[in-house]
Amino acid sequence: VIREKELSGIGSVDPRRMSTLIDEIIAHVHPNDFICIEGFPFATQRAMFAGGLHHGIRNELFKRKIQYYEVAPNALKKFVNVTGWVGETGNKRRLKDKEKKKAVMDAVKELYGYQHKSDNVVDAYILAQIAKDLWTIKSGVFSTLNEGYGRKNQFEVLDTVKG
């Protein structure tokens, strides 16, 4: 079951916004959930907020003894076959912020038929797909994934995340 909801916390001033956002996120977590969270985004304009938010979520999961798997931001993109580059070999250029987000959103629509106006929700959808596939593999459930069928880029991400 997939439910989509963009969480934002209360207000626009920290630490209240960050604290209430962490509370909102944790309110949706159940003890036996299989969780994938995005790794730290080191190349962000809002590093202080992102770092605080990421640590806050991890601390809350730790206090509740809830295991999680961390997915690096580039692995999240790789899972939907977005490299962050466009163009032909020898003439490539790096995608910038909004271009990269749009490329990820377009890839998710193409691969899964899923779309949402928020890139945060789309990223969460990808994390849910990674968690589902990782759970399938770890649980030994009969699946094409356990038979070696699937996209190479996705297997590479799953191998990296499961450790």
Map each language-model feature to its residues.
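Phosphate- and other anionic-substrate recognition elements at nucleic-acid/protein interfaces
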Residues: 1-163
